[in-house]
From Swiss-Prot:
Protein name in the entry: Putative ATP-binding protein BRA0745/BS1330_II0738
Keyword annotations: ATP-binding, Cell inner membrane, Cell membrane, Membrane, Nucleotide-binding, Translocase, Transport
Subunit field text: The complex is composed of two ATP-binding proteins (BRA0745), two transmembrane proteins (BRA0749) and a solute-binding protein (BRA0748).
CDD domains per the UniProt record, alphabetical: ABC_MalK_N
Species in which this protein is naturally found: Brucella suis biovar 1 (strain 1330)
GO cellular component terms, semicolon-separated: ATP-binding cassette (ABC) transporter complex, substrate-binding subunit-containing
Pfam families: ABC_tran, TOBE_2
UniProt-listed NCBIfam families: PRK11650.1
Membrane topology summary: Peripheral membrane protein
Length: 350
């Protein structure tokens, strides 16, 4: 296990800056997730740590050693890709043992490493099968086994679950987290799926347009987003945003409807109120905001409502079965502690 430090890391392609002075400390044994929309630079950053992409500026330090010019094989890292990158003409056993074999390790030592990895990943029944004979989840476990036998100081995962169906993704993210808890290794994991980030990470790094937006524990980001982008990106279903103004302890929409907000948000100014779907509650008649119902989705334990408030699309999740019809107008509100206020122009919290 080693610490990884990124100090002012930048990446440019000609005049295009794709990563802008990234500063980040990954602790030894930490499971750190880089999350953000496509094109935010997260995979490029991971490839720079791996040595697959040259660094344009700044310093990469692995285990106290500057690694900018260190070749990938000297960094003592292992990477699991989105595509499984398995040799089709080799069995699972041969794929897992390929690295030690080409490094000239003894056959008995290689076999022991393969057996150890297979035990961790529950792969013994599949070791003599070829990749074409394995399911997507089994192939990904073989790819993980190939990483484990390297006995690396740092594991890198580049969207490893993107090619799997929804059920397999849930299963595999549980297995990857269990693997980390067993090996206690340093993990840097890239995904665009914030559910993966929330359920797996010790800390999350939210990125957008080549910059870090916020770093923190999953629930810290959920409860205290640093800006409107983080608030809208973290959470599923995502936060709804309603434009209006803040004045004298109330948030007012353009329709004249208002709800109480925190006392710290006093002072008239244009703002947006962010409310998470599960924080909406039915208000008394004539109070709160008016939700115009468009679509109702009963799921059994919950009722999901898609509609509009002050003309803006919102989603509300109620923890009970309620009977509503499209076009119906429902008074809703939220506790002031659950209303996130953002400046209309900057997107920063008020």
């Amino acid at each position: 296990m080693k610490e990884v430090s990124l100090r002012g890391i930048s990446k440019t392609f000609g005049q295009l800056t794709v990563l802008d002075r990234i500063d980040l400390e990954i602790h030894s044994g930490e499971f750190l997730v880089l999350v953000g929309p496509s094109g935010c630079g997260k995979s490029t950053l991971l490839r720079m740590v791996a040595g697959l992409e040259p660094i344009s500026g700044g310093d990469l330090v692995i285990g106290g050693e500057r690694a900018n010019e260190l070749p990938p094989q000297k960094r003592n890292i292992a990477m699991v890709f989105q595509s499984y990158a398995l040799f089709p003409h080799m069995t699972a056993r041969e794929n897992i043992g390929f690295g030690p074999r080409i490094r000239g390790e003894k056959a008995a030592e290689t076999a022991a490493k393969v057996d150890h990895a297979a035990s961790i990943l529950n792969l013994h029944s599949y070791l003599d099968r070829y990749p074409r004979q394995l399911s997507g989840g089994q192939r990904q476990r073989v790819a993980m086994g190939r990483a484990i036998v390297r006995e690396p100081s740092v594991f890198l995962f580049d969207e490893p679950l993107s090619n799997l169906d929804a059920q397999l993704r849930v299963q595999m993210r549980t297995e990857i987290k269990a693997l980390h808890q067993r090996l206690k290794s340093t993990v840097i994991y890239v995904t665009h799926d914030q559910i993966e980030a929330m359920t797996m990470a010790d800390r999350i790094v939210v990125m957008n347009q080549g910059k870090i937006q916020q770093i923190g524990a999953p629930l810290d980001l959920y409860d205290r987003p640093a800006n409107k982008f983080v608030a809208g990106f973290i959470g599923s279903p995502s936060m709804s945003f309603i434009p209006g103004t803040v004045a004298d302890g109330f948030f007012c929409t353009g329709e004249g409807k208002k709800i109480a907000v925190s006392a710290a948000a006093k002072g008239a100014r244009a703002a947006e109120a962010g409310i998470r779907p599960e924080n909406f509650v039915i208000a008394r008649e004539g109070a709160g905001l008016t939700l115009v119902v468009e679509v109702i989705e009963p799921t059994g334990p919950e009722t999901h409502i898609y509609g509009r408030i002050a003309g803006e699309p919102v989603r509300a999740v109620f923890r009970e079965r309620i009977q509503l019809a499209p076009g119906e107008q429902v008074p809703v509100t939220a506790g002031s502690e659950h209303i996130h206020l953002f400046d209309k122009e900057s997107g920063l919290p008020l």
